[in-house]
Amino acid sequence: MTSTTPPKLNALEILDLRSSPPAFTTPSKRINEGSDVARFLTSLAYRDIGVFILQLNRALCPRNQSSSPLPRTFPLNSKPATTPSVQTLQALLAKIGSFIDEAPPDPGPRRFGNVSFRKWHAIFEERLSELLDEGLLGETLKVGDGKAKEEVSLYLLGGFGSVQRLDYGTGHELSFVAFLGCLWKLGFFKDGEQGGEIEREIVLKIIEPYLNVVRKLILTYTLEPAGSHGVWGLDDHSFMPYIFGSAQLTRPINENEPMPLEGSVKGAPKPSDVTKAVVVEDQRQVNMYFSAIGFINDVKKGPFWEHSPILFDISGIRDGWGKINKGMIKMFNAEVLSKFPVVQHFPFGSLFSWDVDPDATTPTQSVHMVNQPAMAAPTPSGPGTSAPWAQATRMPPSGPGIPYSRMPPPGPNSGSLARPPRNTSGTGSTDAQITVTKAPWARDS
């Protein structure tokens, strides 16, 4: 007889601020050279960010309904947010985006980035304290005699690009996710129904609007990709929409089930539809994955397989969006959380701690771990440097995640940049090829 006991589903802890408040502190840099990445992968900060991302990811998975043969899905254009905490952050993002009107792009010639981004960032930084004092946000951040506000503000400030390098990348994106994680720990989202509903609002009604603000910044100030692999990276700027967008399209589950490892919800677009402009334009209104693809189409010209070969390869996966979602999480762990250039600026405080996770396993000396720069290249100090610090948490085994599974159109396919051969087993496997660490929340189930 099959057990009906629901599996334990991890969620980020909400702190008891009355009886056991944390000793808030100004977050500081701890990752100074490549060898520090292995230590980061055993930290409480790494664990907590991973738990939070997987918690949000599962909330987006379609659900079976006892009252209907049709599953419940969670599109971007679902009903407007009604939770006060979510509405507060939507208003915050709207104000941050409005600062663009006060810092129009410089019309002069430039090679990289528009210097007016520095003016925009200065306005943002100048008004940051005031923004965090307003309404529900201000009430939450009063804890610790204002020290919580000081700690949390660094993560929000780090979420909108580098004022020195005039760039934006996955580290900045994760800085914003960490800001949300801080608020979760402080109980800011307790006014919503936890265990699915409030998590969905966080992704669809906060993270997607955040991405829209960032995309406007990128277009307005021609921000460079931060730490980009060029065309051989997944995306020039973001990773979150590919995780959450693939989750939106996975096979439906019951509330007591873990995330599916393969399959798609009925009626979902095919993975290969990312190459069809008409489908992308339609789906970008309802799905985060296609919204990100749509932005790529807005800013890049030429064949999709040529300017986005990794996404093109992924579009050949035959086991559905569940398989892609599983692989995206593994790829995120390998290409963001385990890479020194991305995590080197991650600031550690009381909410995302450098302390060792007692349940962490020792990271394996994999290709990812060995091939780390010895030390960061020197960069100017000052505001805006606290961002390229992708976070993590014992995420699934670190590895490429999604192997090359789709061949490009006929043409040259040799040389140092030739794409790896397609999977010979024909399964489109997304099993990790390189393991960094195996966390309690990362085990396949």
From Swiss-Prot:
Residues 422-436 have a biased composition (Polar residues). It is found in: Cytoplasm; Nucleus. One of its GO terms (molecular function) is protein tyrosine phosphatase activator activity. Its main location: cytoplasm. It catalyses: [protein]-peptidylproline (omega=180) = [protein]-peptidylproline (omega=0). GO terms for cellular component: cytoplasm; nucleus; protein phosphatase type 2A complex. Disulfide bonds: none annotated. Its EC number is 5.2.1.8. Keywords: Cytoplasm, Isomerase, Nucleus, Rotamase. Residues 374-445 are annotated as: Disordered. One of its GO terms (biological process) is mitotic spindle organization. It is an enzyme of class 5 (isomerase). PPIases accelerate the folding of proteins. It catalyzes the cis-trans isomerization of proline imidic peptide bonds in oligopeptides. Acts as a regulatory subunit for PP2A-like phosphatases modulating their activity or substrate specificity, probably by inducing a conformational change in the catalytic subunit, a direct target of the PPIase. Can reactivate inactive phosphatase PP2A-phosphatase methylesterase complexes (PP2Ai) in presence of ATP and Mg(2+) by dissociating the inactive form from the complex. Belongs to the PTPA-type PPIase family. This is Serine/threonine-protein phosphatase 2A activator 1. It comes from Gibberella zeae (strain ATCC MYA-4620 / CBS 123657 / FGSC 9075 / NRRL 31084 / PH-1) (Wheat head blight fungus). The gene is RRD1.
